[in-house]
Design a protein with these regions (language model features):
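Conserved beta-strand positions in repeat-built beta-propeller and related beta-rich domains
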Residues: 27, 41-47, 78-84, 120-125
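A short helix->beta-strand "capping" segment at the edge of beta-propeller domains
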Residues: 7-28
Length: 152
């Protein structure tokens, strides 16, 4: 073969391996978002955020709040998709300290924190939005021809 017709070798595929599983957690049917605060893992379970120790899997905290989908952590606060808004939560007190509108008007499906911004995925619209965490303003949008449920 000539160099014009040869293809680069594809990397060998390995089967996925489950390294660790957590749960089940009491009174929890599903998990809709997960983030790590440097010490604990936080899981959004519909009506509350559950914190657990990643080494043992033991729950360490529970914050009652609406949590429909994605969860993110900025180094100080938790951010939680809750219906048509994003709540900024103080993890020590569980209090919502601010709220901004969610870009998908209730159709948001995942969230992450990176580059000083929130990144919000919209599964149905196949978009990921970079959001200003103080104002909720969409800074940019990435469109995809594939599912974009979680930007993490």
């Amino acid at each position: 073969m000539t160099s014009k017709t040869s293809k680069p070798a594809e990397p060998a595929l390995r089967p996925a391996e489950i390294v660790r599983e957590y749960g089940p957690f009491p009174d929890t049917d599903n998990v809709a978002g997960v983030t790590h605060d440097g010490k604990r893992v936080w899981a959004a379970t519909g009506k509350r955020l559950i914190a657990f120790d990643p080494a043992s899997g033991d729950p360490t905290d529970s914050l009652p709040c609406p949590c429909d989908a994605g969860t993110a952590f900025d180094g100080t606060h938790l951010y939680q998709l809750a219906e048509r808004r994003i709540d900024k939560i103080d993890p020590a007190s569980g209090k919502v300290v601010a709220s901004i509108p969610a870009p998908g008007d209730g159709n948001d499906s995942g969230m992450a924190w990176a580059e000083g911004s929130l990144w919000v995925g919209q599964y149905r619209d196949r978009k990921i939005h970079q959001i200003d965490p103080a104002t909720g303003k969409i800074l940019r949008t990435i469109e995809s021809n594939r599912s974009a449920s979680s930007p993490a």
